[in-house]
Amino acid sequence: MICLLPLIAVMLFVFATHTVLALEIATGIDAPETEFSASTQTTRVSFRRITSVDNKRFLRQETTFEEKPSVNDVHAEERSSFYRKFLYRLFGDRMDVEAKVLARDSNWLINIFRRKFLRWAGREEHPHKATTFDTTCCQVAPYDPVTSS
């Protein structure tokens, strides 16, 4: 009986598929037979007179080059701010992440995310700091016992 369960399941699936396809064919309407009425083919276009106020507003926007964010931009900015703060809380500062990636005992799976974070942090500014720091001047040479004594 247990051996027949997969066979019964496949048969039910095939039966259901054929039933659905038969219903689609029976109720389907071919596109060439359908004719649209004249009222659905025409579209309405409303025209608005352009006034001098509109022209002044357009010129003012052209000269000031102000780009005000739309609603979608505001939501995108809020989301990116949330993710930015989340990543900095999760991984810490950029130099901490670089040290953890270079460490030999670090987890390889987490290092993948740390490397992605490093690429992202190289483009973005820290959300809580006013200035960004250049890490190229702070590179530390590896310890060499021969030259250090």
Swiss-Prot record:
**The keyword Secreted appears for this protein:** yes
Span of the annotated motif RxLR-dEER = 57-79
Q: Which residues form the signal peptide?
A: 1-22
The record describes the protein's role as:
Secreted effector that completely suppresses the host cell death induced by cell death-inducing proteins.
Per its UniProt entry, which superkingdom is the organism in?
Eukaryota
Gene assigned in the entry: RXLR47
Record note on domains: The RxLR-dEER motif acts to carry the protein into the host cell cytoplasm through binding to cell surface phosphatidylinositol-3-phosphate.
Q: Which cysteines are joined by disulfide bonds?
A: none
Similarity comment: Belongs to the RxLR effector family.
- Which cellular components does GO assign to this protein? extracellular region; host cell membrane; membrane
Q: In which compartments does the protein localize? A: Secreted; Host membrane
The name this protein carries in UniProt is Secreted RxLR effector protein 47
Annotated keywords: Host membrane, Membrane, Secreted, Signal, Virulence
